[in-house]
Amino acid sequence: YIGLAISLEGTKKVRINWGRECMRVIHESSNPNVMTHAFGVGVKSVLDNITVTSTDATSWVKRAAYGMIAVDDKSIHVSEVMKAKADDRSLSQQSRALQEDVLKRIKQRGFTLEELEQDSGKRAEFNILDTLDWVAKLEPHNTTFKNGLGW
């Protein structure tokens, strides 16, 4: 295994470019099939643009603790505390179409907006389900790919 610190400071574009450069160097090395682990990378758009064997992240639980839910690659504030804050990530500040999409996903996943506003544990569950939905859509880059969390 090679561990990669892709969660650098900077934009998603910077992290994607760094990850791709790492992949290029590995591909041109004497061991191009080595397994790779991306430390602390939970941003789906970054992971969609690099090829690693595994990754770990705490973004799902951090978002929940800070009053946010994950919807695709967006963090949306829903907690009671954050509702009062004038923030462009607050659900109430989103377009009507996005609000409707988020409310639909909340219902589909078996939650209510009210419980997500009040309960960080429920937000964490919601965020895990968002990640699992994304994982289910992944296509393996190699035959050793394992689509699952191991439990």
Task: Please tell me what each predicted stretch does.
Residues 1-15, 35-39:
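Catalytic beta/alpha-barrel core
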Residues 9-25, 71:
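Active-site-adjacent beta->alpha loops and helix N-cap segments on the catalytic face
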Residues 24-34, 43-151:
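Alpha/beta catalytic cores of nucleotide-metabolism and tRNA/nucleoside-modifying enzymes
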